[in-house]
Amino acid sequence: MALATYSDLKTSIANWLNRSDLTTEIANDFIVLTEADFNSKLRVRKMITSTSITIDSETESLPTDFLQVRDFFITSGGTKYALKYITPAQMDQIRGSSTTGMPSAYTILGDNFRFAPIPDSAYTGTLNYYAKFAALSDTNTSNYILASHPAIYLYGSLYHAANFLGGVDPQRLQQWQGMYTTALERLERNDREDQYGNAPLQQRGDVTVSGAFNDISRIITSNNN
């Protein structure tokens, strides 16, 4: 059957398992676990989104669907200034500094961004980031994965169902896991080809960062003296 909607997917999973008594588990466990899997593993163009963040304090909340930063910059006076990621440990080294100004670095602590220097006024930040795919539900009946790569949902859910049920033929379990992995890899490969065509990928050399980024190194060094 065609897997066009959330309802189609749940019906298909039940048919493949030959079980009509797993309605709750299919919706709340198998599909949800599959979504957690691919949101964790995939970083493809369809996941990239952008949002504007007002940076006027040392910490600002992450977007609710946030997975990973792609790039982050502040626009001030018509100029874009890239924000550099530093580790929480590096941020702790400069914590307590009286330095304020336009932030030039950030880290992530829990569900928050943390900036240094501490902003001395309100700045407009632009965050381009990888976002979770919208979860399927009775009100959100489809998304990019189901519409374009339904095998990810189907075989991922079957794999998680097999682990839940136990007693599934090992060969079938291995087959479902293999099909699930293949579907994920196919999506990643298609995404790379759409971006780069058949051109070979080249390893990037060291990137020299100038300007505000050097300020953080200086702040960390001065705080260690």
Which residues fall in each region the model found?
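Glycine-enriched, solvent-exposed interface loops adjoining structured elements
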Residues: M1-N225
